[in-house]
Amino acid sequence: MGKLFDKIRRVQDKTRPFCSAIVPAAGSSARMGGQDKLLTDLCGAPVLMRTLCAIDRTELVDEIIVATREELLLTVADLCGRCGLHKPVKVVRGGSTRAQSVLAAALEANPKAGLLAVHDAARPLVEKQFKAGLDTL
């Protein structure tokens, strides 16, 4: 029932811009010695899953766009499906740099997006800070 009220609140609040959360996740995890840090288990779930769930709980975000490496597109899409996210999620091919990944995701944002929030995929413990940052806008 809480999700229904969240949707009603969003419809009523027409002053808030549509927000697309961009999650760059195309890095090579070079400092991890070849182990992909985003898929590493953190207390029972991959780091990326925890990050996406935290963003999903943020009321001010309307959609999530994950930019990842080509070889991880299916893996990340499957992970997103297993997260039980409530917001629409897109998984897109990222670039060879963070800037290219952010651009690739931004180009896939909903045309209604008046705000793009970029958050690093490897930082799952963000919920309060992410929300506080968006609240100040």
Give the location of each predicted region:
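Acidic helix N-cap motif at the loop->helix transition within catalytic regions
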Residues: L74-L79
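A short, basic/flexible loop-to-alpha-helix module at the beginning of a structural domain
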Residues: K3-T15
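Conserved donor nucleotide-binding strand/loop of the catalytic core
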Residues: G84-S96
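Conserved beta-loop-beta/alpha segment of the NTase-like Rossmann-fold superfamily
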Residues: T97-L137
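N-terminal glycine-rich phosphate-binding loop and ensuing alpha1 helix
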Residues: R16-E70
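Structural motif
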Residues: L42, A67, V92-R93, H119
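Short glycine-rich anion-binding loops that position phosphate/pyrophosphate groups of nucleotides
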Residues: G27-A30, E70-L72, S96-T97, A121-P124
